[in-house]
Amino acid sequence: MLEHLKEQLIEHGFVLKQRSSQEVFQKIVNTEENKYILKLVKLICTFIQNFKTNGYTVEKFYEWESQTTNERTRLFLDVCQQCYHEYAKRLKEKRAVDFEDMINESARILNQQLISGKTLDFKYIIVDEYQDISRQRFDLTKALGKICDAKIIAVGDDWQSIYAYAGSDITLFTKFKESMGYGQELKITRTYRNAQEVIDIAGGFIQKNDSQLKKALVSPKHIQDPVVIESYTEEVDRKQTKGKGGKYYMIGKTVEDIVDTILEENPKSSILLLGRYGFDAYNLSRSADFIYDEKTGGVQSKRFPGVRLEFMTVHRAKGLGFDNVIIVNARNELYGFPSQIQEDPVLKFVVKDDHSIEYAEERRLFYVALTRTKNRVYIVTPEQHPSKFVTELISDFKNVKVNGKINEVDDANSANIKRCPICGYPLQLRYKPHYGLKLWICSNEPEICDFMTNDLRGGELSILKCDKCQDGYLIVKEGKVEPFLGCTNYKSDKTGCSGFMTKDYYLKYIRKK
């Protein structure tokens, strides 16, 4: 077809010039669609890294393609496979090896040496942070254990397994005996960082995950008011907050008041500000009360300029401890805590998700946040949109102190959040002047999922341009038997455009595209 098109263009006087791949790439990235290209590149890089972290071979691409009927997934796997081969080719040309291949090749070589009868003289293999182990590192550990005939000591805490996005598989820890073929479990139940009251709350919270191993931790330390919820109102006088950060003003003021409370009790206290995302620190600095140094992670309070405050994401703070901890954004929203962002559907092939409970990984992450403190945890949350983790703590534990009001009804409503029937992302209700309607719109990236509807009863039916009149839109309408798509230009007196589409036709021919 391309050759025929080329012949026709030349025949009609067009001068064709072959462009290099680099020129084509530059042409694409210099357009407005560049952001989509960069997101695709990032997605492919993440996929390939996790693909190799799982120890998969190229045959997996063919296996997955044969198992899916989703056209987008098939296209992605095809493109990703070509990128995978090109990446492998470049590594070979440069006589280079990446980190994932170092581990995979090491496991392969050890298994080859074992077959040839060679051995290594090690009696013990100790693996720390075992809860974050990936399949490839497990394969390396197992191969090393076999060739040495060594005892494997795996040290870790499954309650703190928070790196599924990077390839870790929690079941390799929780089902250690099954995966290794043998084993004895020895529990370390005594801790010295957290007070018993913090442990009881954090432990009760995390063990709602059915996939977690059950244990009871004990500490010699005790404290009153181990977890303090500090709520703030978002309904502030705009004139009063003008030039002070607008909607971020109350967050900054609340954090400042908490710092003041901590310093009154201990002027030398180390204070950690914890965020779910890195931009939580940037948002805090927009309150006009704080200055954030992104390079060092240091935060300076204008009210307490001599006090050293440190900001970290929860992932970065894992393993560290501070006198007091402030979780700065416990809000019920897409980028709140728990995060309601869902990964691209294609990553399900290479990321091991824990579906034992809603937000299982986020729950472990929140547990890590709670246990960074040596004394108290302060949680900053809005009155009207509190994190569902916050309302759960208040409901389940009587010694969680609440300063301010909490509208728990919001959390109940959030449990019924409307989700896209195509990709599962939350739906947002917006008025769109272009259509003259309030529409439910998928919050996913438009190039990934463009679902929108005027009526959720239509299921997967999404608004389309009307091909018949080229002026109206096909929106969900209620039929005698089931919903269908009908043109907005059709009038109640049965005049106007009669363009329509049945649900069966839409699902069979349109949605598949």
What are these regions (language model features)?
Residues 347-357, 364-368, 374-458, 500-513:
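Helicase C-terminal subdomain and adjacent C-terminal extension
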Residues 422, 444, 448, 467-471, ...:
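Short, cysteine/histidine-rich loop/knuckle motifs that typically chelate Zn2+
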Residues 183-190, 211-257, 261-275, 309:
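Inter-lobe coupling/hinge region of RecA-like P-loop helicase motors
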Residues 135-236, 339:
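Conserved RecA-like helicase ATPase core segment
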Residues 69-175, 190, 194, 319:
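Conserved helicase NTPase motor core
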Residues 1-97:
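A basic/glycine-biased coupling hinge at the interface between accessory DNA-binding modules
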Residues 266-270, 307, 316-382:
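Conserved helicase C-terminal RecA-like lobe
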Residues 279-296:
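Conserved helicase motor "Helicase C" RecA-like lobe of SF1/SF2 P-loop NTPases
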